[in-house]
């Protein structure tokens, strides 16, 4: 087992969480402004994300999807309530502890890839490990690279890669540290349908084969259908949930949120 470095003020986190959700929010409120200008972005949200599950978050524009994700990972504070990653209360952490948590336990995949243009694919993939001065698990790295089919593109820089290939690099980067949970924000938003499907199939495989936990924000019913479960938000509240979603059934739920 790889030992974690000692970091001042860093919480003690479990290596694996089985009995408790990978992430959860309890009675979360997030407000901006006050009085007549107050906007409630999250309104008494209680939601949990099971370890080893794939959950999609959907809802109309302005429903609170991005706010929920930002609060779950400690990038933004909730006004009241509690947020947990595993058994650790993110709400009680200081900024140093939250930074450590995101580096050690959370993976991110963004719509815009967020690759360093001067680095090769392999250098981008291992960059988080290098910055943290951690030894790279080369056996696991080889497994991830093989899964995303990047073996013949490792020495290419981002401008030499297609959009789909760049996103595969981003997914590999998120996985290489074996995070407790991956948060994906519209990961196929900048891709064509074929490249997007490749990314979604890979994310699905990481859940099925490696037990990875994924929480994905998406507006696309086809993308969301790869998840085990969808949480629907509307006006900052949990409006509905769907288990085993299908592309045909999801639009009906979205229409109901707009009525």
Question: PLM features: residue spans?
Answer:
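ABC family nucleotide-binding domain
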Residues: 20-227, 233, 238
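Conserved beta-strand-loop-alpha-helix hinge in the C-terminal portion
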Residues: 237-259
């Amino acid at each position: 087992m790889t030992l974690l470095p000692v970091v001042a003020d860093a919480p003690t986190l479990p290596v694996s969480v089985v009995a408790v959700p990978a992430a959860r929010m309890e009675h979360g409120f997030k407000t901006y402004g006050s009085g007549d200008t107050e906007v409630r972005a999250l309104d008494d949200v209680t939601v949990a994300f099971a370890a080893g599950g794939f959950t999609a978050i959907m809802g109309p524009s302005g429903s609170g999807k991005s706010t929920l994700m930002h609060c779950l990972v400690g990038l933004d504070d909730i006004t009241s309530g509690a947020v947990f990653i595993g058994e650790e209360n993110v709400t009680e952490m200081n900024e140093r502890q939250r930074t450590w948590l995101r580096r050690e336990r959370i993976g991110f995949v963004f719509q815009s890839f967020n690759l360093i243009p001067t680095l090769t694919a392999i250098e981008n993939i291992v960059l988080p490990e290098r910055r943290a001065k951690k030894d790279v698990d080369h056996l696991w790295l080889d497994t991830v690279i093989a899964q995303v089919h990047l073996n013949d593109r490792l020495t290419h820089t981002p401008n030499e890669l297609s959009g789909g290939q760049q996103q595969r690099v981003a997914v590999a980067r998120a996985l290489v540290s074996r995070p407790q949970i991956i948060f994906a924000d519209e990961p196929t938003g900048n891709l064509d349908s074929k490249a997007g499907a490749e990314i979604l199939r890979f994310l699905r495989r990481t859940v099925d084969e490696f037990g990875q936990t994924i929480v994905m924000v998406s507006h696309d019913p086809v993308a969301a259908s790869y998840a085990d479960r969808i949480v629907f938000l509307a006006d900052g509240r949990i409006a509905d949930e769907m288990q085993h979603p299908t592309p045909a059934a999801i639009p009906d739920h979205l229409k109901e949120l707009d009525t």
